[in-house]
Amino acid sequence: MTTDSDTALLFDPALALPSGPAPRRTSVGVRVGSGPGSVQVGGGAPIVVQSMTNTDTADIDSTVEQVAALARAGSELVRITVDRDPAAAAVPYIREKLDKMGCLVPLVGDFHYIGHRLLTEYPACAEALAKYRINPGNVGFREKRDRQFSTIVEIAAKYDKAVRIGANWGSLDQELLTSLMDKNAGSAAPLSVGAVTREAMVQSALLSAARAEELGLKRDRIILSAKVSSVQDLITVYRMVAARSDYALHLGLTEAGMGSKGIVASSAALGILLQEGIGDTIRVSLTPQPGGDRTLEVTVAQEILQTMGFRTFVPLVAACPGCGRTTSTVFQELARDIQTYIREEMPLWRSRYPGVESLNVAVMGCIVNGPGESKHADIGISLPGTGETPSAPVFIDGEKTTTLRGEGIAAEFKTIVQDYIERRFGGAKSAAE
């Protein structure tokens, strides 16, 4: 029983908590690429989705095919490995073929060990790339490291390219780490090995960025990352980097893993940081199944951002998980079919029906929550549960509009969805024209 005091407490405005993420961390905006395909990372711009190919970059046709597939899936930046001479020689041809296809997605060159030489000897490669990714832990050692790092930065400044300086747990600057470990050993209150390693990660990224600026690379050309494989360590490291700088930040686990493990790890780590306002671009590093679809990492990245309310990419399909009241698989099959249908149609819908990505669809499985959830969606259908009347009421904008019956429910509901989209979003295209 609720008392008067309980009721007052429930409606006390002072107890209400705001919904939504913390304000975005202020960061320097970095323009990656030029022309129609360019994107801004940081500076208040929408959080950018990026991905990476796993083809042999020297295989021009395969790389072009995969870059185009990733871009069609929604990747706004695509990184390619540039690890040897044939790969560097192929880059301008890859760019040319993509441009001819109308695929303007900016390409990021991933350099390790010999990036200084490849960028020097293949100037067409240096020009064709929109951004360079370098790892301060494997540019070189001592004087050689300084010289090789300087070469890459000077080339980036010459061509006005963005640079991601990416420290990695697995290839951390050993000189810096050893120095910090030695200092820690002599401390009156030494930190744990993990704490010192995290500090080394942060310092590696920040010191390298400061050196890049000294060499003439503008602040609005620098993006930082500090990647590890542990979710908790990643969260801590990025909090540290965010607190000490205003560089744009690239988020991602070094190796998230395969299947559901990789998806959960990335969602947990990135979700917490994004909720705290940290992060300007994300990549979900999933280990693909043999022959698996590389675009899955793009889909997961988009779903993280859309689920958290940062961006909208495709209409959301909400479906109940099922229980003993839903022994039929009809609602599961319909939810799957509608989700597939929407993703297949989105390339066309995106251009024809501006704003369609904000659509919410509900496919529910029984009378308990079905009608209510369906009313909250833009379009919803409540399928019959076990023992219920074999009919499926359809709700549009909160109002029941029709009831579907028989074997053609799925096809009829798809038609209703298509008609609603044309009616609600078709006018936006006409108005724009």
Curated annotation (Swiss-Prot):
Reactions catalysed according to its record: (2E)-4-hydroxy-3-methylbut-2-enyl diphosphate + oxidized [flavodoxin] + H2O + 2 H(+) = 2-C-methyl-D-erythritol 2,4-cyclic diphosphate + reduced [flavodoxin]
Q: One of this protein's GO BP terms?
A: isopentenyl diphosphate biosynthetic process, methylerythritol 4-phosphate pathway
Q: What is its EC number?
A: 1.17.7.3
What does the entry's cofactor note say about binding and number? Binds 1 [4Fe-4S] cluster.
Concerning its family, UniProt says:
Belongs to the IspG family.
List the pathway annotation.
Answer: Isoprenoid biosynthesis; isopentenyl diphosphate biosynthesis via DXP pathway; isopentenyl diphosphate from 1-deoxy-D-xylulose 5-phosphate: step 5/6
Q: What is the name listed in the Swiss-Prot or TrEMBL entry for this protein?
A: 4-hydroxy-3-methylbut-2-en-1-yl diphosphate synthase (flavodoxin)
Outline what the protein does: Converts 2C-methyl-D-erythritol 2,4-cyclodiphosphate (ME-2,4cPP) into 1-hydroxy-2-methyl-2-(E)-butenyl 4-diphosphate.
Q: Where does [4Fe-4S] cluster bind?
A: C320, C323, C366, E373
Identify the Pfam families for this entry: GcpE
Q: Which GO terms describe its molecular function?
A: 4 iron, 4 sulfur cluster binding; 4-hydroxy-3-methylbut-2-en-1-yl diphosphate synthase activity (ferredoxin); 4-hydroxy-3-methylbut-2-enyl-diphosphate synthase activity (flavodoxin); iron ion binding
The cofactor required is: [4Fe-4S] cluster
Query: Which PANTHER family is this protein grouped with?
Result: 4-HYDROXY-3-METHYLBUT-2-EN-1-YL DIPHOSPHATE SYNTHASE (PTHR30454), 4-HYDROXY-3-METHYLBUT-2-EN-1-YL DIPHOSPHATE SYNTHASE (FERREDOXIN), CHLOROPLASTIC (PTHR30454:SF0)
Asked whether the keyword Iron is assigned, the reply is yes
For this UniProt record, the keywords arranged alphabetically read as follows:
4Fe-4S, Iron, Iron-sulfur, Isoprene biosynthesis, Metal-binding, Oxidoreductase
